Amino acid sequence: MKIYSALLLAGTALFFTHPALATVCRNSNGTATDIFYDLSDVFTSGNNQPGQVVTLPEKSGWVGVNATCPAGTTVNYTYRSYVSELPVQSTEGNFKYLKLNDYLLGAMSITDSVAGVFYPPRNYILMGVDYNVSQQKPFGVQDSKLVFKLKVIRPFINMVTIPRQTMFTVYVTTSTGDALSTPVYTISYSGKVEVPQNCEVNAGQVVEFDFGDIGASLFSQAGAGNRPQGVTPQTKTIAIKCTNVAAQAYLSMRLEAEKASGQAMVSDNPDLGFVVANSNGTPLTPNNLSSKIPFHLDDNAAARVGIRAWPISVTGIKPAEGPFTARGYLRVDYD
C-alpha cells in the first residue's frame, strides 16, 4: 500500500489597487478671476418697490476661467463648489436669494456645458470630463449664461453706496472630500444706487452740536457709557422734505457712523463719544437698521423730527485733553 502525502497550500489573494488621489485645483493664472457686477443705474421709480425683482443683463459668454490640477491627479473629472458667506433668505423657483444688504436680496443661476443649469450656493457639483485634468494642463471651467436677479426688500431713498462684496467663491476639486481652500474664481458686486425718491435732511446742511469745554476728569468720573456731570443734552429739530415720495408716507430716520461702540459714535479721541437719541431721550444705536425714529410725512411730503445728543465716556479712562469730534449721518428710509 502506498501512502500519499498531500500538501495543501492555502493562500489569500491580495488585490492591490492604486486609489485616485484627491486634489484641489487652482486658477491656471495663479490668482482667482473675479466676475464683477455693477449695481449702479439699475433702479428706477418703477422697480424701487418691495417685492420687485430686477434681472441684470445676462453674462451669456463663457466666464473665461481655466483651472489646473496638481501633480498626483489621476482622474479626469472635477467637482465645483459655489460658496457664499451671505445667508439664504428664501428660495423662489430654484433661485436661492441671499441677503446682499438691508435693501436687496440677490440670486443667481449658472449653466455648465455638461451639468446644465444650477443655482448656487451649492457644493461639489459633478462636472464633465477633460483629459487635461490628469495631465496638469489648463482646462476650461465651463460656466456661462450667468443670470443675476435682485429683489427689493426695502425701497431706496436718495443715494445708497453698496461696497464691493464677494457673493460666491468658486472652487474646483477632484473629490467630494477635498477641502475648499483655493478659489478658482469669484463673483462680486458693488454700486452706487441713486433713485428718484429722495429726502433732504436739514435743507442739506450739517447738523452741529457744540458742547464747549468739558473737564477731562469729569469723563473718567462719569464712567464708561455715561454723560459727565453738569453737561446738559442738546435738542434740535430736523426738517425733512421729500421729493417723489407720496404724501402721508411712513418713513424713519436712523443713524450711521464711521466708528461706533454700543450706542455711541466714537470720536477722534477713542475714549470719548456722543450719543444721539430721539426727542424722548431713547438712544439710537449707530448702523442698526432696527434702531430708528419713525415719522409721518404731511400733505406736502415734509416732516419735522426732534433729536437729542450728549457726550459720553466710551472707556471710562481719563481722556487726553483737547477738542474731540465725531461725524455721523442721518439716513431716511421707508418704514
Swiss-Prot record:
Signal peptide: 1-22
Chief localization: other
Gene3D superfamilies: Fimbrial-type adhesion domain (2.60.40.1090)
Keywords tagged on the record: Fimbrium, Signal
Recorded family membership: Belongs to the fimbrial protein family.
Places the protein is found: Fimbrium
Entry-linked InterPro entries: Adhesion_dom_fimbrial, Adhesion_dom_fimbrial_sf, Adhesion_dom_sf, Bact_Fimbrial_Adh_Pro
Organism: Salmonella typhimurium (strain LT2 / SGSC1412 / ATCC 700720)
The protein's name: Type 1 fimbrin D-mannose specific adhesin
Taxonomic placement: Bacteria, Pseudomonadati, Pseudomonadota, Gammaproteobacteria, Enterobacterales
One GO cellular component, as annotated: pilus
